[in-house]
Amino acid sequence: MSTETASGPTEDQVEILEYNFNKVNKHPDPTTLCLIAAEAGLSEEETQKWFKQRLAQWRRSEGLPSECRSVTD
């Protein structure tokens, strides 16, 4: 039975996304994003959205602003 809901990826998909986020690249280029999406069985839009949210979460945990700004701000 699938636990997949309209609200987001399954546990297995999140595992793939987390692995890529932590071990491969926090800022995947379009080609890498496409490969990660294919591996996780998600659309590129869903994958990109997940990475964006995950990056904001990571930046907050590191004590950084959730959005990228220049160092001079």
Swiss-Prot record:
Keyword line: Cytoplasm, Developmental protein, Homeobox, Nucleus, Repressor, Transcription, Transcription regulation
GO biological process: chaperone-mediated protein complex assembly; heart development; lung alveolus development; negative regulation of cell differentiation; negative regulation of transcription by RNA polymerase II; positive regulation of gap junction assembly; positive regulation of skeletal muscle tissue regeneration; positive regulation of striated muscle cell differentiation
Annotated localization: Nucleus; Cytoplasm
Subunit-structure text: Interacts with serum response factor (SRF). Component of a large complex containing histone deacetylases such as HDAC2. Interacts with the acetylated forms of HSPA1A and HSPA1B. Interacts with HSPA8.
Chain residues forming the annotated DNA-binding region: 3-62
Keyword set includes Cell cycle: no
Name recorded for this polypeptide: Homeodomain-only protein
Molecular function GO labels: DNA binding; histone deacetylase regulator activity
InterPro entries: HD (IPR001356), Homeodomain-like_sf (IPR009057), HOPX (IPR039162)
